[in-house]
A protein has these predicted regions:
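Short, Lys/Arg-rich, polar N-terminal cytosolic tail immediately upstream
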Residues: 1-20
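Gly/Ala-rich beta-loop-alpha elbow adjacent to hydrolase catalytic centers
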Residues: 383-390
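C-terminal His-loop and adjacent cap/lid subdomain of alpha/beta-hydrolase
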Residues: 14-379, 399-574
């Protein structure tokens, strides 16, 4: 009797195995659809169809796996010995048919309000949202991503079974013991593969991509000739050692003549000193060069000395630097130190301790030299940090009193990552009744937090006047850098329970696992938001400086004059 080509025994074993990867468990499909629908709910920032498809696929795959686990456990614990299980073939057919019909229909229908939700979030950011027809493409991406993840997991399960069968044949082990050992072996191999190959390979590729960029020079930027700048012919830090961001920092900004026109009185040439990765072999050597640069440029005779730990790439926000220089009419010195050329999020994953060690070393080196000066001949000592630079700066202080003890006049930390040690400690110990998004600590005497709504927001939540050192955190309610944490996987944070901030959707909630991946996706889009939203603080930084480090006699009108110059840089140069 001939064998039909459609019968399973006529197929090649590899084809049978490959086809088995596509066969789905119906309980898993139901949970996968549920988690996909939950992933469509709004988060901190707008998501286009591609990002939503990625997040939807990841969450659908997790939901599928959870559903399979629940279904299998329920069968083994409750149903295997039940008299009424399994139901009749007819009932089982209609149960499966219902899942097949309802799951995809629910996913498609949920995309319609999801597009509307994204338009609402986009409106909060001041940008245009997606169209509903265009957003339907989300389902295609999610299906592909989900299928790949589920298939990958099934391959791992098959690998465990293969190892278990080998152990049973070779050592005659009990099934459960063989499965346990097989799982341990596959997990160990998987961890080795991920940590030893994939992760290291990712960082190696990131380094290979970023290093040439760091060796380049920004378009339109040339070596400074003024001795007040690192990289100049008179500098101890050669131009070609400063890195991409360092060269941009020392070669840009307003000069004395432009500041004089802006402020209507003679200005000083701002001092900008910087050390790149190639300026010296290590951080201590680079710090020594910077202290030498500060002495060479007579930076300690200026009105303000600003220490600015950089972000991962070595970037110092030009708004932070220029606004302070405008406020003090050039009577300033700014010092920065590069510790990496990788983007901040990669530096954070690769070695966040490196940024903290570098920041601590920079602050200690400059502070030690500053402290040697007679008290009445010291400049105002000011600290600034944005994003990973904020985390680097906080590493220099075990607790808040250390900031005052070291003699800092003002500290401005912008968009601190959630793992920042001092920020987290202050949030945990905030005054009773204040929220995580708008916290208050010690009635705002030394440290304050602002959403950067307007210039007056810094004082709005304070219950007492400033006392001594002024420390200010700027944190947008929509900034995922501030709010992302692994804790989002299984814990609802206070900021998602309390009243929302000004630019966070009222529709955002918390769902286990789902919210974690949503906010993770928001991280990739955080800096592309308009100023005042996400991780783009723009001219909000000026309001921060006006709050913590205003020159004598500074007024709200002066702040607006500088703001106009920041918004129209050409006006000061004309």
């Amino acid at each position: 009797m001939s064998t039909s080509p459609t019968e399973p025994r006529s197929r090649h074993p590899l084809l049978v195995w490959a086809w088995s990867l596509l066969r789905l468990k119906f309980v898993g499909v139901a949970f996968g659809a549920l988690f996909f629908c939950l992933s469509l709910t709004p988060s901190l920032l707008p998501r286009d169809w591609l990002f939503q498809g990625l997040i939807g696929g990841v969450n659908a795959a997790f939901g599928y796996g959870l559903g399979v686990l629940i279904g299998t456990t329920t069968y083994r614990v409750l149903l295997r010995n039940a008299r009424w299980w399994p139901p009749s073939a007819r009932v089982l057919f209609w149960m499966k048919a219902a899942v097949v019909a309802i799951a995809p229909t629910a996913c498609v229908l949920m995309l319609i309000p999801a597009a509307s939700w994204q338009r609402q979030v986009s409106a909060l950011m001041g940008i245009e949202g997606p169209t509903t027809p265009g957003y339907l493409r989300t389902l295609i991406v999610a299906a592909v991503v989900g299928a790949l993840l589920v298939s990958t997991f099934r391959v791992l399960i098959d690998a465990v079974r293969l190892v278990a069968r080998m152990l049973i044949r070779r050592w005659h082990l009990h099934d459960e013991v063989a499965l346990f050992i097989g799982t341990a072996i596959v997990v160990a191999l998987l961890i080795t593969l991920i940590d030893g190959v994939l992760v290291r390979g990712f960082f190696a590729v990131a380094s290979a991509v970023s290093q040439p960029q760091d060796s380049a020079t920004p378009s339109g930027v040339s070596q400074p000739q003024l001795p007040e700048r690192s990289g100049s012919p008179a500098s101890l830090a050669p131009w070609d050692t400063l890195g991409y961001q360092g060269r941009d920092f020392v070669a840009t900004g307003l000069h004395a003549a432009e500041l004089s026109r802006l402020n209507g009185k003679p200005a000083k040439e701002p001092i900008r000193v910087y050390a790149g990765l190639h300026t010296a072999p290590d951080d201590p050597g680079r710090s020594d060069v910077l202290v030498g640069e500060l002495a060479r440029t007579r930076a300690f005779t200026r009105k303000v000395l600003l220490i600015a730990p950089t972000t991962g790439t070595g970037w110092i926000d030009p708004v932070a630097a220029s606004s302070l220089e405008m406020m003090y009419n050039g009577d300033t010195a700014i010092v920065g130190l590069q510790y990496s050329y990788l983007p901040s999020w990669i530096s954070f994953l690769a070695d966040r301790q490196k940024s903290m060690d570098s920041g601590r070393l920079l602050i200690d080196a400059v502070h030690d030299r500053w402290e040697q000066l007679p008290p009445d001949h010291r400049p105002k000592l000011v600290l600034y940090g944005e994003s990973l630079g904020s985390m680097a700066g906080q590493a220099a202080f075990a607790w808040l009193p250390d900031v005052r003890r070291m003699g800092f006049d003002a500290v401005l930390w912008v968009g601190p990552p959630h793992e920042s040690p001092l920020w987290r400690a202050l949030i945990v110990r905030r005054d009773p009744g204040s929220t995580e998004v708008r916290p208050r600590y010690d009635n705002g005497r030394t440290v304050r937090f602002s959403e950067a709504i307007d210039p007056a927001d810094v004082d709005r939540l304070a219950g007492a006047p400033w006392v001594g050192t002024r420390v200010l955190f700027l944190q947008h309610p929509s900034d995922p850098v501030v709010w992302w944490s692994p804790d989002l996987l299984f814990g609802r944070p206070d900021w998602l329970i309390e009243p929302r901030g000004r630019d966070r959707s009222a529709l955002m909630g918390w769902n286990p696992v789902v919210t974690f991946w949503q906010v993770s996706a928001d991280l990739t889009n955080a800096e592309s938001m308009p100023g005042g939203h996400g991780h783009n603080y723009g001219n909000d930084i000026l309001d921060g400086w006006a709050a913590v480090a205003p020159p004598d006699g500074w007024t709200a009108g002066d702040t607006e004059r500088v703001r106009a110059a920041l918004q129209n840089p050409g006006s000061a140069r004309s």
